[in-house]
Each structure stands twice: as C-alpha cells, then as structure tokens.
Swiss-Prot record:
Effect of W485A: Abolishes interaction with PACSIN2
Entry keyword set: Acetylation, ATP-binding, Calcium, Cell membrane, Cell projection, Cilium, Cilium biogenesis/degradation, Coiled coil, Cytoplasmic vesicle, Endosome, Membrane, Metal-binding, Nucleotide-binding, Phosphoprotein, Protein transport, Transport
Phosphoserine: residues carrying this PTM: S355, S456
Residue intervals of the EF-hand domain: 476-511
InterPro entries hit by this protein: DUF5600, Dynamin_N, EF-hand-dom_pair, EF_Hand_1_Ca_BS, EF_hand_dom, EH_dom, EHD_N, G_DYNAMIN_dom
Physiological role: ATP- and membrane-binding protein that controls membrane reorganization/tubulation upon ATP hydrolysis. In vitro causes vesiculation of endocytic membranes. Acts in early endocytic membrane fusion and membrane trafficking of recycling endosomes. Recruited to endosomal membranes upon nerve growth factor stimulation, indirectly regulates neurite outgrowth. Plays a role in myoblast fusion. Involved in the unidirectional retrograde dendritic transport of endocytosed BACE1 and in efficient sorting of BACE1 to axons implicating a function in neuronal APP processing.
Residues noted as binding Ca(2+) in the record, renumbered to the chain: D489, D491, D493, E500
Binding site for ATP: G65, Q66, Y67, S68, T69, G70, K71, T72, K220, W258
Positions of region (G5 motif): 243
Gene name per UniProt: Ehd1
Name of the protein in its database record: EH domain-containing protein 1
Subunit structure: Homooligomer, and heterooligomer with EHD2, EHD3 and EHD4, ATP-binding is required for heterooligomerization. Interacts (via EH domain) with MICALL1 (via NPF1 motif); the interaction is direct and recruits EHD1 to membranes. Interacts with RAB35; the interaction is indirect through MICALL1 and recruits EHD1 to membranes. Interacts (via EH domain) with PACSIN2 (via NPF motifs); regulates localization to tubular recycling endosome membranes. Interacts with PACSIN1. Interacts with RAB8A. Interacts with FER1L5 (via second C2 domain). Interacts with MYOF. Interacts with ZFYVE20.
G3 motif: annotated segments: 153-156
Spans annotated as G2 motif: 91-92
C-alpha cells in the first residue's frame, strides 16, 4: 500500500551516482533544470538549451579585439602553424568567426555544416541565421595544442554605425553566446595605437556577466619605449575602468605575441615573464574545465529561477478578458518595481536579475496570455539540485582535477619555454651557473672568506649565532634568512663551514636581486666538498 510514496522517498534519499562530472552535469541539466527553463520559455529570453556537446567539448579560448590588434597572429604564435582560412594584414582581414579545432586532416568546415553536427557545440548558432553562418567556419588541423583546447578567432571590431549595420547579424549577441560557453575570453589591444571604439565598448559591456573569464593582452608592446609603454598601460586601465564596472582590476598581460625579433628590446624580461604567466593561465584551462562548466550551470540555474518568478508575476497581474494590451504596456514599463518586489519576497540578490532594459525589449513582442503561473515543484527541484547534487559534484571536480597535470596544454609555443636554456628564468637567480663546470659560488668565495674568518670559526666552522650577526645585515626578514640557513647547512650539523657560509651569502645575493629561493638546493649549488661525500 502507498508503494509510490516509499518509492519517491527512496529516490530522494539515495543520491544519484555519476561516473564523471560532465555526465553528472548533463543529467542534472536534463532532469532538473531544463523542465523549469521550458515551462517559463527561458530560451526565448536568454540562452538556447544546452546540448550534450556543451558538456563534453574541450576548453575554448575566445579572442576579441579591434582590427589589426594581432588576434590571428596570436593564434599562429600559440600553435606555431598556419591554419586554413588564416589571413593576416594591417587592414581588417579576418571577416569571419573561425573556430580553430583539432582534426585528423587540415580542412575547413563551413558554418551551415557545423551547426548540424551533433558532436560540435555550435548547433544553437543556427538561430543567428544565414548572414552569420556564411561568416562562420571551423578550421581543423592536427596540432598538439589543439588536442587540449580550441580557439575562436573573431572579426576585427570596427568603429562607426555603418560597419555595425552592414554585418547583417547581431555581432554583440553572437559574442555573448560564445562568452557563455568558452573558458577564457582574451581582449587584445594594440599598444602602438590604443583606441577603444564605440562598438568595442558595447562588446565589452555585452560580456559583463563573464568578468571572471576575461583577460586583457596589450599586444605589440615592443614597438614603443618604456616611458610610452607606462603611459599606454595607464590609459588602457583608465579606459577599461569606465567600461568594466567591477571593483577588481582586470589582469593585463603586456608583450609582443609573435615570433619576430623585438623592435625595442628594452623590456625583454618583462615580456618573457608576462608571456609565461599568460601561458600558465591558458595551460590551466583543461584542468579547470569541469569547475568552469559547474560554475556556468549554477549561474544559469540562478537566472532560470529569477526568470520563472518574473514570468509568473507578469502572468498573475494580467487580466483574464479585457484590457490586456494596456495592462501589458503598464507591466513592461513598471518592470523595475516587479524586480524589487521579487527581490524582497524571495530574498534574491539584485545581481541575479537579467538586464532591465533588455528584458523590457524582449517582453514587448511576447504574448503574456501564454505565460505560466508559478509552479513551486519545479523551483523546489532546482533548489534541491543547487543544495545537494552540486555539492556532490564539487567533490568529484576536485578528484578529477587532482588526476590532471597542472599544465595540460602541450606543443606549439608552450613547449618553447618549458625546459632548456630558453626556458623562463633559466640560468638566472638560483639557476645561475647551472651549466658551469666550476662551482658558481667559487668566484665570490674569497670575499666571503674574509668575512668568515672574522666570525671566530672553531675547527673551521662558525655557529648559528655568529652567522646570524652577519646575515641580518642584509635586512631580509627572519623567515627568509631561516630558509637560507636551512639550504646552506648542507650537512645539517647546525654549523657552517667556509663553503656553506659562502653559499648562504650567495643565496642572500640571489634574494636581494629579486629572485625566488628554490625549495630544495639545486645540485649545481652543492659545495664541492659535500658532493664527494654523497
């Protein structure tokens, strides 16, 4: 008796088990979030329904910038290979959206064929029509970098109303569609001719819900001198501050991202360090992909909940028979008050609400009589998903991350800076003398010996107290000096001989020059007398 009650209760008690995070997200979306979206026509207002490919696709990087800022050259620099459909020049060359992806052979897949392929995450782009699809293609080629990530090249953004209208499709809406699904958005600026056009400002504003994905690259920085570069950097930060309304400062990478010689090499070290940081950021994307998809699903669920409250509130206010049109106009005009009412009644943050102006525009064309009343069961299901299922998936995300290397992207420009003499920081700081036959500390040892013999050595060694008197003269914090002591006391006897003292002074010099100390003493820094005993 009442077997259906016990069955339902059992289903609630027993959490669903998933093999992977992607599978879990796919099932949760289809079973718990999609019914809410469909019931309140979410897809007509915000974003098309997600498909299997959206949960399984590789991390994607979206490049956005004005024409001739080096977007296509940047991709060429990363993968170290020309790709089909690539055009580079000072004039606006890239006139299409090009998805650069891995494939067994080189070739181009046109947009109309791409949007019918269920294995690709682009099927919902058919909503933008032929004008867009004729300007969309996939360049596929066998390349080790593309094994781990895909890159989206975009048309250069131009200034002027004529350019915006002549595209034939809503450029900002297409970018917003991609922004929802990519893992990283890179905005490129040309340091030599810094300018943010009106259309570029609109595009950046369209990406405002995805600030966590945005990184900025100030490209072609080798074309200007240090003093000018400082001014350009300041001007860029000031301009971005007016467009991106967040209290946090967006991360800006400065460099020259191509394989040609630097025109003005003054800032070579800065460019190398910045390039290394950007590469590390891109290399972390495969490891963080599952977390990004989880985060995006949570954002989508919160928006879907708010949307359900908005639509059901409008339905509740509509008359049954007369005066529907006049009431509709009144409700659209007073949508801000409805937002405030929902915010108060359901304790929802104002940041979860969609853009008021955009929502008002979309509601003008809708038939309010087809809207649905509030259905608490659908909302309860989504709340349960956010409270319980997502927490379980979070544990799986951490497990999957721990099994992946921190730098998963290999090949192309990423291999050039990994190891060897041209790796970042090779032969500098604690790495100085790594390839020398002689002990690198030896050249300064006579100077250090003079100090050593003034510190009252006993049996050729000085105590920690005597060493401390000399080491604190460097004015380095005790935490740093403590680490240097541990590294220099190679035989761990609590005393320093002349070689160990010289090593301690060498490490102090390394730190004072602005380099980091190694976690363990590199083999080339071990004093010669200690090597024989190993």
């Amino acid at each position: 008796m009442f077997s259906w009650v016990s069955k339902d209760a059992r289903r609630k008690k027993e959490p669903e088990l998933f093999q992977t995070v992607a599978e879990g997200l796919r099932q949760l979306y289809a079973q718990k979030l999609l019914p809410l979206e469909e019931h309140y026509r979410f897809h007509e207002f915000h974003s098309p329904a997600l498909e299997d490919a959206d949960f399984d696709n590789k991390p994607m990087v979206l490049l956005v910038g004005q024409y001739s800022t080096g977007k296509t050259t940047f991709i060429r620099h990363l993968i170290e290979q020309d790709f089909p459909g690539m055009r580079i020049g000072p004039e606006p060359t890239t006139d299409s959206f090009i998805a650069v992806m891995h494939g067994p052979t080189e070739g181009v897949v046109p947009g109309n064929a791409l949007v019918v392929d269920p294995r690709r995450p682009f099927r919902k782009l058919n909503a933008f029509g032929n004008a867009f699809l004729n300007r969309f293609m996939c360049a596929q080629l066998p390349n080790p970098v593309l094994d781990s990530i895909s890159i989206i090249d975009t048309p250069g953004i131009l200034s002027g109303e004529k350019q915006r209208i002549s595209r034939g499709y809503d450029f900002a809406a297409v970018l917003e569609w991609f922004a929802e699904r990519v893992d990283r958005i890179i905005l490129l600026f040309d340091a030599h001719k810094l300018d943010i056009s009106d259309e570029f400002s609109e595009v950046i504003k369209a990406l405002k819900n995805h600030e966590d994905k945005i990184r900025v690259v100030l490209n072609k920085a080798d074309q200007i001198e240090t003093q000018q570069l400082m001014r350009v950097y300041g001007a860029l930060m000031w301009s971005l501050g007016k467009i991106i309304n967040t209290p946090e400062v967006v991360r800006v990478y400065i460099g020259s991202f191509w394989s040609h010689p630097l025109l003005i090499p003054d800032n070579r070290k800065l460019f190398e360090a910045e390039e290394q940081d950007l590469f590390k950021d891109i290399q972390s994307l495969p490891r963080n992909a599952a977390l990004r998809k989880l985060n995006d699903l949570i954002k989508r669920a919160r928006l879907a909940k708010v949307h359900a409250y908005i639509i059901s509130s409008l339905k509740k206010e509509m008359p049954n028979v007369f005066g529907k049109e006049s009431k509709k106009k009144e409700l659209v005009n007073n949508l801000g008050e409805i937002y405030q009412k929902i915010e108060r009644e359901h304790q929802i943050s104002s940041g979860d609400f969609p853009s008021l102006r955009k929502m008002q525009e979309l509601l003008q064309t809708q038939d309010f009589s087809k809207f649905q009343a509030l259905k608490p069961k659908l909302l309860d299901t989504v709340d349960d998903m956010l409270a319980n299922d997502i927490a379980r998936l979070m544990v799986m995300v951490r497990q999957e991350e721990s099994l992946m290397p921190s730098q998963a992207v290999k090949g192309g420009a990423f291999d050039g800076t990994m190891n060897g003499p041209f790796g970042h920081g090779y032969g500098e700081g604690a790495g100085e003398g790594i390839d020398d036959v002689e002990w690198v500390v030896g050249k300064d040892k006579p100077t250090y010996d003079e100090i050593f013999y003034t510190l009252s050595p006993v049996n050729g060694k000085i105590t920690g107290a005597n060493a401390k008197k000399e080491m604190v003269k460097s004015k380095l914090p005790n935490t740093v000096l403590g680490k240097i002591w541990k590294l220099a006391d190679v035989d761990k006897d609590g005393l320093l001989d002349d070689e160990e003292f010289a090593l301690a002074n060498h490490l102090i010099k390394v730190k004072l020059e602005g380099h980091e100390l190694p976690a363990d003493l590199p083999p080339h820094l071990i004093p010669p007398s200690k090597r024989r005993h190993e």
